[in-house]
Amino acid sequence: MGGPAVESANFLAQAHLHLQQARWPQAHDGFARAVHAMPQSAASHHNLALCQLALGKPEMARQSAERALFLMPSLWQSRMVQGNALKSLGRPEAADDAFAQLLQAQPTNGEATLARADLAINVFGTPLQAVEWVKPLLADPAHAADAQLTILMASVYDRDSSAAELSTAVMAFSKQHLCLPGGLLPPLPPAKLRSRPRVALISPLFCVSPVYFLTIAGWRHVAKGSDIVVFNRGHQLDWATEQFKSLATEWWDVQEMPASALAQRVYQADIDVLYDLGGWMDPVALQALSAKPAREMYKWVGGQSLTTGLDTFDGWIGDEWQSPAASQHLYSEPIVNIPGGYATYTAPHYLPDAPVHKRATPVIFSNPAKLSRGFLAWLAKLPGPKLFVHRQFRFERTREKVVQAVGAANVEFLCPTSHREALEVLGRHEWLIDTFPYSSGLTAREAVAMGMKVKTFTGELFCERHSLHLKAG
């Protein structure tokens, strides 16, 4: 009884339930069925786009979102999905245009403002622009917390406040906004007696990234006597991902899982020791870890710019240069320093040999967000040519930030298309100039491995002291 209309209503209701509970594969199947049954339903195309994006299918998400917009141009949420899909497809300027188009129609749209600010910090290298954009949202209860977090993260790159003031603000933010409600998880049972402890890694960066180059040697050692359980929060898959997979006893893809569900998933995995390798690159995972879903938890490489502000970690893994004992007041986590250095650099097989004769032009090879006002002002006083190397310098607005501060006369930009190409460019030069306040971590180690010299600076935060071990060496 009821016929096709009732049947359609039933599976559509089930699809919405799956969507609300972030059961993405089931929701995807339901809305795909809905789109087939009701091809003129903008809402179904939009919800299908949401699922496709969550499942790491950005091109399909873009197409579905644009179909929804064609059917209902006023459906601004589909413009957001379109922009986020374009970002995932490596088309940030098109993504920015999508968000800007939405803001032309709705100037106070908080989601679009935050999305543009994210691109400003993480792609175009203009954190101060991001701060100016989100400041009005501090008065908007629906978006104030996200705006505050954006300002805090931008301040890591360029700020007027002290390290202590920023760390205190981060701790206050985490206490207010990053802690899941108490009682979400039952008390953890005592650790079981077993020959191989269960060691969990959680990160969106199980790929060609500092997480691979600075931690894989450690995990290869740990895997000899422990079962490695990976909670993968990222969609990028490459040769480094395969290296992590080769060590994993269990591999869980939990990319779009909300914080409470993620905390429960980790809890159910019966983890003895968990290492967070995402940090502020993944605030949702940090929120999940606020519930202490593993018996012991440590913060290590990956978004390890400054304290998480959480009191559930058993330690912050650092070393005497980056997190000296005297800096404990900057951390909510107990500092656990590794003698001789907190990480071991594993070079890729394509690391070029150091040439005998190196070029004198100094190189600035850094995420453009690290090019602070103070650093660029210092650089402007340095005579002679400078070479800026990063794929993000392909964007005019990113280059313009440098040219306005340093001048165009002695500036050259190179935009390598791969990590391998970047290393080949870097290794031809004698000097790498480190940035401040946010310093080079992996890049400085790569430079030294290729026989380069590094001009370093010293700050107080963890991310401001990455290169100090080079001075000691």
Model-derived regions, located:
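Alpha-helical solenoid repeat scaffolds of the TPR/TPR-like class and their adjacent stem/linker regions
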Residues: 1-359, 376-377, 402-404, 420-424, ...
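Short donor-sugar binding/catalytic loops of nucleotide-sugar-dependent glycosyltransferases
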Residues: 18, 205-206, 366-370, 393
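Short hydrophobic "strand-cap" motifs at the C-terminus of beta-strands
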Residues: 202, 364-367, 390, 414
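Glycosyltransferase donor-sugar binding loop
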Residues: 231-236, 387-400
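Active-site donor-binding acidic/aromatic loop of nucleotide-activated sugar
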Residues: 253-255, 409-418, 435-436
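Short glycine-rich anion-binding loops that position phosphate/pyrophosphate groups of nucleotides
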Residues: 279-281, 368, 438-439
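Catalytic binding pocket for nucleotide-activated donors in carbohydrate/polymer assembly enzymes
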Residues: 426-431, 435-473
